[in-house]
A protein has these predicted regions:
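Hard-cation-handling environments
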Residues: 1-14
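Glycine-rich, acidic loop segments that terminate in or are immediately followed by a histidine
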Residues: 14-110
Length: 110
């Protein structure tokens, strides 16, 4: 299923953001890993959550940028928690979808 979804996106050297409904943390990480390993984005962020509650679980993945630093920066701006390795970070943001997208775009600008 995730392979089909990943196939919908072309290879890209730009950041990729994906919001999906109803995924658990394992699925979020799997989809993020698949997308960044297939070079669908320079940095990939997959989120799943609830706009009404203002909470999104996330995974960030990249082989080109340190995900620990990105996660820390985004957590600070989005009332988030989480961490990880240089290749992948995961956690939860307490913010609106638009805020998450805006901060991701700001933090991944070249």
């Amino acid at each position: 299923l995730f392979g089909l979804k990943a196939g919908q996106y072309p290879k890209s050297n730009r950041p990729l953001t994906l919001f999906e409904e109803g995924l658990n943390m394992v699925q979020i990480r799997q989809l993020c890993t698949l997308l960044y390993e297939q070079e669908k984005g320079s940095v990939v962020m997959v989120c799943s959550g609830n706009e009404a509650q203002g909470e999104y679980q996330y995974a960030l993945g990249s082989s080109l940028m340190d995900m620990r630093a990105l996660s820390k920066a985004m957590n600070g701006k989005l009332y988030g928690r989480g961490g990880g390795s240089s290749l992948m970070a995961q956690g939860t943001f307490r913010a609106s979808r638009q805020s998450v997208m805006d901060v991701f775009q700001e933090e991944t600008k070249s």
